[in-house]
Amino acid sequence: MTKKQRDIVFDRASELHTPVCEVMVPGVCGYNATQWHHRKLRSQGGTNEASNGCAVCALCHDHIHRNTGRAYEKGWLVKSHANPLETPCLRRGEYVVLDDEGGYTPEMETE
């Protein structure tokens, strides 16, 4: 992963110049983002693009990998056949679609 790729994700996560966990699992989160999490695992073809990354605290990162069923439901993990650019994830309590420029858009609700 390049410094630029890492910076894009950690800039998206920053509030007042401090990277804050993008996952924020209630009752688990340690708040400060210190790790990069690949939504689609590298072993499944995941890249280092911003849409495939979340800045997370160590506690949420551990929770994701210990609770994979929930992580796939929340979009924190992405299946090998899916595209992270098209897979919403729960970011700080809101479902969003991440882009490769370091931004995100709220998921459109369907009826």
Model-derived features: where do they sit?
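Histidine-centered nuclease catalytic patch
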Residues: 22-55, 66-74
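Arg/Lys-rich, low-complexity, intrinsically disordered N-terminal tails that contact nucleic acids
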Residues: 1-9, 104-111
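Context-gated lysine
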Residues: 3-4, 40, 74, 79
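Short flanking/linker segments adjacent to small metal-binding domains or redox-active Cys/His motifs
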Residues: 76-111
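Short connector loops at helix/strand junctions that flank enzyme active sites
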Residues: 16, 48-52, 84
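Short cysteine-rich loop/turn motifs with clustered Cys
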Residues: 2-35, 54-60
